[in-house]
C-alpha cells in the first residue's frame, strides 16, 4: 500500500510477532500492537510482551500496546491450549498429527477481524492509510488452516467488501512464505538497521516466550511443538537462544 506508515499488528509476545514488530519499526512505521487474552494456559507471553514494549518505548520508538480480553469468546474452545481444558499439550514436531489438538478454533481470523476494525477506525480518524499484519509463517501452514495464504487472502477480501472505507486499509503477512529461521534473521536484521547493539537484541529475544508448557519459574520445556520449532530456528540461524530452558 502506497503512502502508508501506520500498522496494526497482532503481538502475542512470541518470537514470530516480535520479529514482525521489529520489521515494521525498522521501516519507520507507527505501530499499534494488540495482544489477546483468550484464556490460554499461562500468561507468560503477555507479561513478556509488556517488558519488550517498555524497552522499545524507552528507546523512543513509536509503538503502543493494548491487551484485549477474549476469554468469553473462546470459552467453548476444545483446544489443548485453552486453560480450562485438562487435555495434555502434545510434545514433538508440528508436522505430527497429534499437534492438531493445539488448534484454537478460528483464532487468527478473529484476531484479524478485530485488528481490521481497529485499523479502519484509525484510518477514518486520521484520513490516512493503515495496514494490518500478522506474523504467520510457512511453518504454521501444516497444522493451522487459518494461517495459509488461501485463508488470509479470503479474509482480506471478506473484510474489504464488508466495510465502507476499506480502500484505506490493507492486509499483509510479510512472513507468510518464510520459515522460522528466516523470520528470525529478518527480525534481527531489522534491529541492526535501527542501531540495536548485541545487548539490545538479546534483551528483545529474552523478552519473547514460545513454550506451551513452561515450568513454575517460566522456563521453557524444550519438548513441545513450538519449543522444537524455536530451537531449530535458532540453530539454523547460527544463533544462541537466550531464554532459559528446563
Task: Kindly label every feature range from the protein language model.
Residues 1-201:
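ATP-dependent adenylation/nucleotidyltransferase module used to activate substrates
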Amino acid at each position: 500500500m502506497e503512502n502508508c506508515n501506520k500498522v496494526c499488528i497482532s503481538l502475542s509476545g512470541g518470537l514470530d510477532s516480535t520479529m514482525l514488530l521489529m520489521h515494521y519499526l525498522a521501516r519507520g512505521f507507527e505501530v499499534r500492537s494488540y495482544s489477546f487474552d483468550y484464556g490460554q494456559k499461562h500468561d507468560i507471553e503477555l507479561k513478556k510482551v509488556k517488558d519488550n514494549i517498555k524497552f522499545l518505548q524507552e528507546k523512543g520508538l513509536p509503538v503502543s500496546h493494548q491487551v484485549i480480553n477474549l476469554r468469553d469468546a473462546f470459552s467453548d474452545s476444545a483446544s489443548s491450549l485453552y486453560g480450562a481444558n485438562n487435555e495434555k499439550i502434545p510434545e514433538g514436531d508440528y508436522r505430527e498429527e497429534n499437534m492438531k489438538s493445539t488448534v484454537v478454533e478460528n483464532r487468527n481470523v478473529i484476531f484479524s477481524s478485530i485488528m481490521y476494525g481497529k485499523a479502519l477506525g484509525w484510518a477514518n480518524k486520521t484520513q490516512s492509510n493503515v495496514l494490518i499484519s500478522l506474523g504467520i509463517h510457512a511453518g504454521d501452514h501444516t497444522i493451522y488452516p487459518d494461517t495459509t495464504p488461501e485463508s488470509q487472502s479470503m479474509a482480506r477480501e471478506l473484510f474489504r467488501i464488508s466495510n465502507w472505507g476499506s480502500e484505506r486499509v490493507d492486509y499483509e503477512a510479510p512472513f507468510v512464505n518464510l520459515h522460522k529461521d528466516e523470520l528470525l534473521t529478518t527480525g534481527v536484521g531489522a534491529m541492526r538497521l535501527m542501531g540495536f547493539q548485541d545487548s539490545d537484541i538479546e534483551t528483545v529475544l529474552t523478552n519473547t516466550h514460545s513454550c506451551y508448557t513452561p515450568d513454575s519459574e517460566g522456563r521453557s520445556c524444550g519438548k513441545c511443538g513450538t519449543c522444537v520449532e524455536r530451537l531449530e530456528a535458532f540453530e539454523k540461524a547460527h544463533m544462541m537462544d537466550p531464554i532459559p530452558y528446563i
